[in-house]
């Protein structure tokens, strides 16, 4: 997951124009069609890409904190229980 976030982060950091940003958002929505359909409007795709980025960042941050504290990473089960990885 870290490499996925780093790739997305690098793409965003290399943006120089709004067009570059929209190209990245289109790329994310095409490669992550499990999140949003391509027929969605541009504002909806922008929102979905932002949500994806936020969720990845939170997951990676949690994994780093767990590792620094010597605690195994946790996976949230659908029933609300955590399991060690």
Curated annotation (Swiss-Prot):
The UniProt entry, under Pfam families, shows: U62_UL91
Q: Which family does it belong to?
A: Belongs to the herpesviridae UL91 family.
This chain's protein is named Protein U62
Q: What organism is recorded for this protein?
A: Human herpesvirus 6A (strain Uganda-1102) (HHV-6 variant A)
Tell me the domain of life: Viruses
């Amino acid at each position: 997951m870290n490499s996925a976030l780093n790739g997305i982060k690098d793409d965003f950091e290399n943006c120089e124009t709004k067009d570059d940003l929209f190209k990245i958002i289109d790329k994310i929505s095409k490669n992550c069609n499990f999140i949003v359909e391509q027929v969605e409007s541009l504002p909806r795709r922008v929102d979905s890409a932002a949500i994806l980025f936020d969720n990845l960042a939170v997951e990676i941050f949690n994994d780093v904190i767990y590792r620094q504290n010597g605690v195994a990473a946790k996976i949230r089960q659908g029933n609300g229980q955590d399991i060690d990885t």
